[in-house]
């Protein structure tokens, strides 16, 4: 076995072991959290204007994202905090958005803000934007102040493109949009959890094959995969616990940061197609309703209900049918995203892989 191959195998083995450890630890934490949430009546409130079939979920424990976030943070700090800058960024974003989501969940549960059932949309938006701006600066700034990505992006059929300072506002938009998109998708049992598992898994493979220098990020992705898989144990239909804003906002923002760090964020709409379509369906529904109300005096709708998974429920699909079909779409999209990343990968990364391989071959020849 060549030296390069041995290193790659070792990196993948470490990532898979972290995924397995995350799965086991999340199962343990999850069992405790479900019991704790039921005991203290941390049950979710269900929108009365949603599908009537969802009313049976009233009182189901929420804030289940804590089992994922806590596991990922602990395992990353203990076993994957080697390159501090590259790992502190996704960890910092995950924790920041988790705190915001946890407070919002708590206010919703306690009724402290009975009129809004949590933070106002505008307040959450500006907090999320502020955190996303700091993360974008950290990605753009040169070392030792940042990760020195300098606005580089890999575009299929084009190659490596430097978009300069435009990277910062684009990165902010991606982080805020994907965070909210995952939150919107988290409306059916295991729907968000499955698609997060697929998306992080896809970027784990991409960073392993297309960007070997980001092996710590690969290990981080697989840690999240293991934790999300264990969460599905409790979130499978009928769910024992919901992810809540704590999990959805934090994992969505973290997924966006991982995509940005890998320089393959242009593929995020493909890999995370379910999240993107769910969010767009809500924006289209809201925008069209407001426009028709202004234009015709009455609000009209494009879909029976937004987001899109509710539309299909009202068409007669059962919740498991909607989830399984959306997951199948997400699976194919993840495979397509990985394929595009490999076909149109970074020339720089290919050079970095080929050079060690040449060195190994020359060494073998000397022996």
Curated annotation (Swiss-Prot):
It is an enzyme of class 2 (transferase). Keywords: Cell cycle, Cell division, Cell membrane, Cell shape, Cell wall biogenesis/degradation, Magnesium, Membrane, Metal-binding, Peptidoglycan synthesis, Transferase, Transmembrane, Transmembrane helix. GO terms for cellular component: plasma membrane. It is a multi-pass membrane protein. Catalyzes the initial step of the lipid cycle reactions in the biosynthesis of the cell wall peptidoglycan: transfers peptidoglycan precursor phospho-MurNAc-pentapeptide from UDP-MurNAc-pentapeptide onto the lipid carrier undecaprenyl phosphate, yielding undecaprenyl-pyrophosphoryl-MurNAc-pentapeptide, known as lipid I. Belongs to the glycosyltransferase 4 family. MraY subfamily. This is Phospho-N-acetylmuramoyl-pentapeptide-transferase. It comes from Chloroflexus aggregans (strain MD-66 / DSM 9485). The lineage of its organism: Bacteria, Bacillati, Chloroflexota, Chloroflexia, Chloroflexales.
């Amino acid at each position: 076995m060549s030296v390069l191959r041995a290193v790659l195998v070792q990196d993948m083995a470490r990532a898979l072991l972290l995924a397995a450890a995350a799965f086991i630890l999340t199962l343990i934490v999850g069992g405790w959290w479900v019991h704790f949430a039921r005991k203290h009546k941390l049950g979710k409130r269900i929108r009365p204007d949603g599908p009537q079939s969802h009313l049976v979920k009233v009182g189901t424990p929420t804030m289940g994202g804590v089992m994922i976030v806590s596991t990922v943070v602990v395992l990353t700090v203990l076993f994957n905090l080697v390159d501090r800058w590259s790992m502190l960024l996704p960890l910092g974003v995950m924790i920041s958005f988790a705190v915001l989501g946890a407070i919002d969940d708590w206010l919703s549960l306690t009724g402290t803000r009975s009129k809004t059932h949590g933070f106002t949309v505008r307040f959450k938006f500006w907090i999320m934007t502020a955190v996303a701006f700091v993360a974008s600066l950290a990605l753009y700034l040169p070392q030792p102040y940042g990760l020195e990505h300098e606005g580089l992006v890999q575009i299929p059929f084009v190659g490596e493109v430097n978009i300069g300072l435009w990277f910062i506002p684009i990165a902010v938009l991606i982080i805020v949009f994907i965070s909210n998109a995952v939150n919107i998708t988290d409306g059916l049992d295991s729907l968000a959890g499955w698609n997060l598992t697929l998306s992080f898994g896809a970027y784990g493979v991409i960073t392993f094959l297309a960007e070997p220098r980001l092996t710590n990020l690969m290990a981080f992705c697989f840690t999240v995969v293991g934790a999300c898989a264990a969460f599905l144990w409790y979130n499978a239909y009928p769910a024992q616990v919901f992810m809540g804003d704590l999990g959805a906002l934090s994992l969505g923002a973290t997924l966006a940061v991982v995509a940005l760090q890998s320089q393959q964020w242009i593929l995020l709409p493909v890999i995370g197609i379910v999240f993107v379509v769910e969010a767009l369906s809500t924006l289209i529904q809201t925008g069209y309703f407001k426009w028709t109300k202004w234009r015709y005096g009455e609000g009209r709708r494009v879909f029976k209900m937004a987001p899109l998974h509710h539309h299909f429920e009202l068409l007669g699909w059962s919740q498991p049918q909607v989830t399984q079909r959306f997951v199948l779409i997400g699976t194919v999209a993840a495979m397509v995203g990985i394929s595009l990343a490999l076909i149109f990968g970074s020339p720089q990364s290919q050079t970095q892989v080929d050079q060690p391989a040449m060195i190994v071959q020359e060494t073998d020849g000397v022996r």
